[in-house]
Amino acid sequence: MGARKHNSAEARKEALKQMYFAKLRNVPTSPRKMRLVADMIRGMEVNRALGVLKFSNKEASARVEKLLRSAVANWEEKNERKAEEGELFVSRICVDGASTLKRLRPAPQGRGYRIRKRSNHVTIYVDTLNNDNN
């Protein structure tokens, strides 16, 4: 590996140590449906976001709620203390498309219609409201 590439990789590694995130991979829900849930909590304070997700009637909200709890636990693990009320917020949430399973549905006259069963990857980043202590 060249020196420039090595230095940029080290810088990325150091930047990741300052971020608090959780990833959920290969979720069997379409990215479009998952983005509806992600848009509900983007930029919200964590406790309020957990309340919104708990009472949402979307199927994807239970998965995002569990992922958000994991991101908060990751923050607590890195900082070696419990998160206080109103201290954390959802700084970023990304929903990216994952692999698609393709299936055939029988159609008239010997044809087959393609069914695309989509899946996605979700990444949640949490951060403190006041970044003075980091």
Curated annotation (Swiss-Prot):
Organism: Porphyromonas gingivalis (strain ATCC BAA-308 / W83)
Keyword annotations: Ribonucleoprotein, Ribosomal protein, RNA-binding, rRNA-binding
Source organism superkingdom: Bacteria
Lineage of source species: Bacteria, Pseudomonadati, Bacteroidota, Bacteroidia, Bacteroidales
Family recorded in the similarity comment: Belongs to the universal ribosomal protein uL22 family.
Protein name (database record): Large ribosomal subunit protein uL22
Subunit annotation: Part of the 50S ribosomal subunit.
Record PANTHER family: CHLOROPLAST 50S RIBOSOMAL PROTEIN L22-RELATED, LARGE RIBOSOMAL SUBUNIT PROTEIN UL22M
Function of the protein: This protein binds specifically to 23S rRNA; its binding is stimulated by other ribosomal proteins, e.g. L4, L17, and L20. It is important during the early stages of 50S assembly. It makes multiple contacts with different domains of the 23S rRNA in the assembled 50S subunit and ribosome. The globular domain of the protein is located near the polypeptide exit tunnel on the outside of the subunit, while an extended beta-hairpin is found that lines the wall of the exit tunnel in the center of the 70S ribosome.
This protein's record includes keyword Ribosomal protein: yes
GO cellular component, one term: cytosolic large ribosomal subunit
InterPro entries on file: Ribosomal_uL22, Ribosomal_uL22_bac/chlpt-type, Ribosomal_uL22_bac/org-type, Ribosomal_uL22_sf
